[in-house]
Amino acid sequence: MKKTLITSIIILILCSYVVIIKFDIINKINNIGLNPKDAFYNLFLILKKEGIVETIYIVKKKFTHDLRLNGFDYSLSNKDSYPEIESNKKRLSLPLNKIIRKISSKETKESFGQSYLNDKWHRSHGGNSSAKYSVLEQINKKNIKNLEVAWKYKSLSNNINRYEIAGTANNILSENNLNVETNPIIIGNRMFVPTVDNHLLSINAVTGTLIWKIKLPYMVARRGLTWEENKDFSKSRLFVPSSKGVYAINAQSGKILKDFGNKGQIGNQLSLIAPIVTKESIIIALIKPAIEAYDTKTGKLLWSTSLIKKVKNDKNVFLTGAVPWGGMSFDEERKKIYVVTGNARPEVVGIKRPGDNKYSNSLLAIDLNSGKVDWSFQEVAHDLWDFDIASPPILATIEKNSKKIDVVVAVTKIGNTLLLDRDYGKPIFDAKFKIAPTSDIPGEKTAAYQPSFNLPEMFMDSTFTIKDVTNISEIQKKNILLKIQNSKMGFFETPSLEKKITLFGVSGGAQWTGASFNPFNSTIFIPYTRVPWQIIVNYTDLKLRDRNFSNFDGHNKYQLNCASCHGFNREGKYKADGNFFSSSLIGISFLNKKNNLDNFNNFKNMHSKIIPNQNLKKISSSDLNDIKNYIYKIDKLIDKEKAFGINGFWKKLVDNKNCPGSKPPWLFLKAINLETGKIIWNYEDPINSYMENSNKKDVSKCKKVPNYGFTMTTAGKIVFGIFGKKIKAFDIENGNLLWSYELDEDLSAPPSTYEYNGVQYITFVSSHTSNNITTFKLR
């Protein structure tokens, strides 16, 4: 006990030093609205709620990001010491394509039936199949125009102070985490839904009145929750993910069941997605180790499967594997758990995670009894673009060659629909992988092939071209053309120290919201965004970044003329989803980009499009020379200390009006027939939904374009698509718009549907500045 207390005090002192004293850390805190005093207070909250180990992890991740960087053990001034740069010539000598052949009809097993056909919504996403489908058909395409609001529930007032919300370190330190992303579950006339301030609610699903409300000590049900079937509701249990494992809660009373697991908890790490409950075990997904099974009766650990492979003897790398944060589904007959996984870490730069990074960016099947991986299918190998698979896998049954077969489906950020046989993980259509570009970063070893699927047809292409540049106005077009000048674009172009890359897919394509499947026409419905991003890689200073260098000649001129944009420590400044970006100057003396400092005309030409002319005129050739020498001298010192590292990040490409840098529309709903692999219809959300004063000739600023869309489908032959504040219902066969309704706030989770006393209801959750539930029925 004494040892633990001493350790806690030491950790608190060290973390306090990191958060409060180090200047660059304070800047990062202030960027999200926290001053050092608030940061210190929140550190106490983190320690109290997360424990020592998780606090260390969070502080490392949030603040000392350079601990995860790829540090160099060689000198940048000695090119002979550089690690090998990949040979493009050698890459091009390989076969153009690699094909994984489709499964034959003889190999496929007979279908066990459509287990997703039910009228219950006892697990988020509609059940263990995650199909977001219901057999309910009282509300259908003929009468949907008669929908009316049955009830509304508001759990919070507007204008929440996000820093008063006690949750995980992630929740406290995140800039924008005030969304309920869990679609409610309904048992009889009880609805269960979390709130943004870490409460779990039980609401009367017919009247919208509150039954009970409990607050958990950790972030609650971020992406889903599950009810365990029980004929005696008073003894039934909810399994609720949190930032500290999964809670078992009595569904009737809302009390934590302290006699289960570890005082009502199983697992001890961040869990985002809905657990799977079987007769013998409860399956949960954790950020680490990955997938765990616990005894249903006692909460005792049965097995634990890690999908993360740590790099030996490397303190700079946290993860090199996959995190199952997107979702999972369960096949009762096969006793298989299907999981999608995240990308490898560190992101963007993979020097110290060589190889394909097995199990990352993959769809996997895990045996229920043993926890062993039965098979895995990787979409993107050695990911450098944040192309993880975020959408929950869907279990569906389709017909091929007059034979019904069971498949698992996952839609991806780059526009692919992974359609695999559930038994062996083989594709239903040939899966083609095309030869991919090499990297110009020393030591980076890219994957030779990346996906280029023909069927199912891609619902989106991740490649950005000049033709995609915005056409909203000439001013906005010119602004984007300037931002992509000298940018790399093309099929899986790799991150570079010399150039940005511009692409679609960093935030979707398809995201965690997932797709829905309707068995009536074997069609999957995919909501997605098509908004461009840029990936930037730069050198970073791992040791000397906080040194003042005021004794160096040129220091004052740099601080006066350059620091406001490039930062006092030369790291650059940017906003991930904003218009502003200023590049890092660290290590520029070792890059071709130094020509912009070596040549006064180059410097003026480049900056004339960025800073006011009157400010530019104040900088003479002599001033630039002093500034250049100052920067180069620091670079030499960093190199001498072998303190250079490399870092990568991404930011949304937006124009000067804060609109996405690509041509509208930006949000879509697409329908793909899984038996043919063909797109059968497409809906494009109108641009005027996201423009301020869109009726005027002069385009003003864009409103925030929603990052994600949501969907749910029913036997009534309708599919609901959600875009921002708007709910829209479509005919599943042709995509005709049947009905729409606009709420006061953006919706933040897929809808749920249920029936009670012969009446079908559909419920929607919207959140951010408040927490609203709006439920409809036929009038």
Predicted regions: what they are:
Residues I25-E137, A447-E474, I480:
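N-terminal pre-domain segments of enzymes
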Residues W121-H125, E175-H199, V220-V246, L270-I291, ...:
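Repeat-blade elements of multi-bladed beta-propeller folds
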Residues W151-A169, L216-Y218, G261-G267, S304-F318, ...:
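Surface-exposed loop and turn segments in beta-propeller and other repeat-based domains
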Residues I249, A290-L301, D356-G371, D421-G425, ...:
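Beta-propeller blade signature
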Residues A381-L384, I389-P392, K432-S439, K500-T513, ...:
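Conserved blade-ending motifs and adjacent loop-strand segments that build the rim/top face
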Residues N538-K557, K573:
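Electrostatic cytochrome c docking/interface patches
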